[in-house]
Protein backbone atom coordinates (compact mmCIF):
# COMPACT_ATOMS: atom_id res chain seq x y z
CA UNK A 1 0.00 0.00 0.00
CA UNK A 2 1.16 3.56 -0.69
CA UNK A 3 0.20 4.44 2.89
CA UNK A 4 2.78 2.06 4.37
CA UNK A 5 5.87 3.79 5.72
CA UNK A 6 8.59 2.73 8.10
CA UNK A 7 9.73 4.44 11.30
CA UNK A 8 13.23 4.54 12.76
CA UNK A 9 13.08 5.06 16.53
CA UNK A 10 15.93 5.91 18.90
CA UNK A 11 15.18 5.95 22.65
CA UNK A 12 17.16 8.20 24.97
CA UNK A 13 15.85 7.24 28.43
CA UNK A 14 14.41 4.12 30.09
CA UNK A 15 10.97 5.74 30.16
CA UNK A 16 10.73 6.74 26.53
CA UNK A 17 12.40 3.48 25.62
CA UNK A 18 9.34 1.72 27.01
CA UNK A 19 6.98 4.18 25.33
CA UNK A 20 8.63 3.85 21.94
CA UNK A 21 8.80 0.06 22.14
CA UNK A 22 5.09 -0.21 23.00
CA UNK A 23 4.22 2.18 20.19
CA UNK A 24 6.39 0.19 17.77
CA UNK A 25 4.60 -3.05 18.68
CA UNK A 26 1.20 -1.46 18.09
CA UNK A 27 2.15 0.27 14.84
CA UNK A 28 0.93 -1.67 11.77
CA UNK A 29 3.84 -0.46 9.64
CA UNK A 30 7.50 -1.59 9.74
CA UNK A 31 9.48 -0.09 12.62
CA UNK A 32 13.23 -0.20 13.29
CA UNK A 33 14.13 0.30 16.96
CA UNK A 34 17.72 1.42 17.57
CA UNK A 35 18.95 1.00 21.14
CA UNK A 36 22.44 2.31 21.86
CA UNK A 37 24.50 -0.10 23.95
CA UNK A 38 25.69 2.87 25.98
CA UNK A 39 22.18 3.18 27.40
CA UNK A 40 22.10 -0.37 28.78
CA UNK A 41 23.44 0.60 32.25
CA UNK A 42 21.31 3.77 32.47
CA UNK A 43 18.71 3.73 35.24
CA UNK A 44 15.59 5.85 35.54
CA UNK A 45 11.97 5.90 36.62
CA UNK A 46 9.64 3.95 34.33
CA UNK A 47 6.04 4.51 35.51
CA UNK A 48 3.46 1.84 34.79
CA UNK A 49 0.96 4.35 33.40
CA UNK A 50 3.10 6.08 30.79
CA UNK A 51 0.93 7.83 28.19
CA UNK A 52 0.95 6.66 24.56
CA UNK A 53 3.58 8.26 22.36
CA UNK A 54 3.21 9.58 18.82
CA UNK A 55 5.95 8.04 16.69
CA UNK A 56 6.04 11.07 14.43
CA UNK A 57 6.58 13.68 17.16
CA UNK A 58 9.77 14.92 18.74
CA UNK A 59 9.77 16.08 22.36
CA UNK A 60 10.90 19.44 23.70
CA UNK A 61 12.57 18.18 26.87
CA UNK A 62 13.78 21.62 27.96
CA UNK A 63 12.52 25.02 26.90
CA UNK A 64 14.92 27.84 26.11
CA UNK A 65 15.17 31.14 24.29
CA UNK A 66 18.69 31.55 22.87
CA UNK A 67 19.73 28.35 21.05
CA UNK A 68 17.88 25.28 19.77
CA UNK A 69 19.80 22.06 20.46
CA UNK A 70 18.51 18.96 18.66
CA UNK A 71 19.73 15.50 19.63
CA UNK A 72 18.61 11.91 20.16
CA UNK A 73 19.63 8.61 21.71
CA UNK A 74 22.73 8.45 23.89
CA UNK A 75 23.76 11.98 22.91
CA UNK A 76 20.67 13.49 24.49
CA UNK A 77 22.07 13.13 28.01
CA UNK A 78 25.27 14.85 26.89
CA UNK A 79 23.21 17.57 25.24
CA UNK A 80 21.28 18.19 28.46
CA UNK A 81 24.53 18.36 30.43
CA UNK A 82 25.95 20.89 28.00
CA UNK A 83 22.72 22.89 28.16
CA UNK A 84 22.95 22.97 31.97
CA UNK A 85 26.50 24.33 31.83
CA UNK A 86 25.59 26.87 29.16
CA UNK A 87 22.79 28.24 31.32
CA UNK A 88 24.61 28.14 34.64
CA UNK A 89 28.04 29.39 33.57
CA UNK A 90 27.30 31.53 30.53
CA UNK A 91 23.67 32.62 30.85
CA UNK A 92 22.72 30.94 27.57
CA UNK A 93 19.17 29.55 27.54
CA UNK A 94 19.10 26.36 25.45
CA UNK A 95 15.97 24.66 24.14
CA UNK A 96 16.67 20.91 23.91
CA UNK A 97 14.69 18.70 21.53
CA UNK A 98 14.76 14.89 21.65
CA UNK A 99 13.98 13.64 18.15
CA UNK A 100 12.95 10.15 19.34
CA UNK A 101 12.27 9.32 15.68
CA UNK A 102 14.81 9.90 12.91
CA UNK A 103 12.34 8.64 10.30
CA UNK A 104 10.08 10.48 10.05
CA UNK A 105 11.65 13.71 11.27
CA UNK A 106 9.37 16.06 13.18
CA UNK A 107 10.42 19.20 11.35
CA UNK A 108 7.48 21.38 12.51
CA UNK A 109 8.70 21.12 16.12
CA UNK A 110 12.23 22.05 15.04
CA UNK A 111 11.00 24.92 12.87
CA UNK A 112 8.95 26.34 15.73
CA UNK A 113 11.94 26.26 18.07
CA UNK A 114 14.34 27.80 15.54
CA UNK A 115 11.81 30.55 14.83
CA UNK A 116 11.95 31.37 18.55
CA UNK A 117 15.72 31.13 19.12
CA UNK A 118 17.24 31.94 15.73
CA UNK A 119 20.13 29.54 16.32
CA UNK A 120 20.37 25.78 15.71
CA UNK A 121 22.86 23.15 16.90
CA UNK A 122 22.42 19.46 16.04
CA UNK A 123 24.33 16.82 18.01
CA UNK A 124 24.45 13.12 17.19
CA UNK A 125 26.84 10.23 17.72
CA UNK A 126 27.26 9.46 14.01
CA UNK A 127 29.72 11.25 11.75
CA UNK A 128 28.51 14.55 10.35
CA UNK A 129 28.82 13.54 6.69
CA UNK A 130 25.57 12.00 5.49
CA UNK A 131 24.06 12.18 8.95
CA UNK A 132 20.71 13.19 10.37
CA UNK A 133 22.17 16.56 11.29
CA UNK A 134 22.94 17.39 7.69
CA UNK A 135 19.39 16.53 6.64
CA UNK A 136 17.86 18.70 9.37
CA UNK A 137 20.21 21.58 8.53
CA UNK A 138 19.30 21.33 4.85
CA UNK A 139 15.57 21.36 5.52
CA UNK A 140 15.80 24.34 7.86
CA UNK A 141 17.91 26.24 5.32
CA UNK A 142 15.58 25.35 2.45
CA UNK A 143 12.31 26.13 4.18
CA UNK A 144 13.01 28.69 6.90
CA UNK A 145 16.34 30.33 6.20
CA UNK A 146 14.86 33.63 7.34
CA UNK A 147 14.48 32.24 10.87
CA UNK A 148 18.25 31.82 11.25
CA UNK A 149 20.43 34.53 12.77
CA UNK A 150 23.60 32.47 12.29
CA UNK A 151 24.88 29.28 10.66
CA UNK A 152 23.52 25.87 11.65
CA UNK A 153 26.21 24.02 13.62
CA UNK A 154 26.60 20.24 13.78
CA UNK A 155 28.36 18.06 16.34
CA UNK A 156 29.27 14.49 15.40
CA UNK A 157 31.97 11.84 15.46
CA UNK A 158 35.27 12.18 13.67
CA UNK A 159 35.30 10.92 10.09
CA UNK A 160 37.04 7.63 10.85
CA UNK A 161 36.09 4.01 11.65
CA UNK A 162 35.03 3.54 15.27
CA UNK A 163 37.87 1.79 17.15
CA UNK A 164 37.35 -1.13 19.53
CA UNK A 165 39.31 0.41 22.41
CA UNK A 166 37.08 2.45 24.77
CA UNK A 167 39.84 5.06 25.13
CA UNK A 168 40.12 5.51 21.38
CA UNK A 169 36.34 5.40 21.07
CA UNK A 170 36.11 8.40 23.39
CA UNK A 171 38.63 10.19 21.16
CA UNK A 172 36.52 9.60 18.05
CA UNK A 173 33.09 10.38 19.52
CA UNK A 174 31.93 13.85 20.50
CA UNK A 175 30.80 14.66 24.02
CA UNK A 176 29.66 17.42 26.33
CA UNK A 177 32.63 19.66 25.54
CA UNK A 178 32.04 19.66 21.80
CA UNK A 179 28.32 20.26 22.24
CA UNK A 180 28.91 23.09 24.70
CA UNK A 181 31.46 24.71 22.41
CA UNK A 182 28.97 24.59 19.52
CA UNK A 183 26.17 26.04 21.66
CA UNK A 184 28.40 28.88 22.83
CA UNK A 185 29.57 29.55 19.28
CA UNK A 186 25.95 29.70 18.11
CA UNK A 187 25.16 32.15 20.91
CA UNK A 188 28.18 34.30 20.08
CA UNK A 189 30.07 33.44 23.25
CA UNK A 190 33.50 31.91 23.86
CA UNK A 191 34.30 28.83 25.91
CA UNK A 192 37.25 30.68 27.47
CA UNK A 193 34.98 33.27 29.06
CA UNK A 194 34.90 31.23 32.28
CA UNK A 195 37.71 30.45 34.66
CA UNK A 196 38.19 26.79 33.81
CA UNK A 197 36.90 26.63 30.24
CA UNK A 198 34.03 24.69 28.78
CA UNK A 199 35.71 21.31 28.93
CA UNK A 200 36.25 21.38 32.67
CA UNK A 201 32.75 22.49 33.53
CA UNK A 202 31.05 20.10 31.15
CA UNK A 203 33.12 17.24 32.53
CA UNK A 204 32.24 18.14 36.11
CA UNK A 205 28.54 18.32 35.30
CA UNK A 206 28.50 14.94 33.53
Question: How does the language model describe each region?
Answer:
Residues 29-30, 151:
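A generic secondary-structure signal marking the coil-to-beta-strand transition
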Residues 37-206:
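Thiamine diphosphate
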Residues 18-22, 105-106:
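Beta-rich nucleic-acid/ligand-interaction surfaces
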Residues 1-6:
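Short, small-residue-biased leader/transition segments that mark boundaries at the very start
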Residues 13:
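Ferredoxin-type iron-sulfur electron-transfer modules in oxidoreductases and energy-metabolism complexes
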Residues 23-29:
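Basic phosphate/pyrophosphate-binding loop/patch that engages nucleotide-derived ligands
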Residues 7-8, 120:
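Short, well-ordered beta-strand core segments
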Amino acid sequence: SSDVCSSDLVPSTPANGKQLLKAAIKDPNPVIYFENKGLFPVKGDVPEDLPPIDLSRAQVVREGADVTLVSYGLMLTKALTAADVARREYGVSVEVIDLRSITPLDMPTIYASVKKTGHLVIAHEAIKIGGVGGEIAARVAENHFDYLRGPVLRVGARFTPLPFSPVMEDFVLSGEKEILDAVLAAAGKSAVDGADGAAGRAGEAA
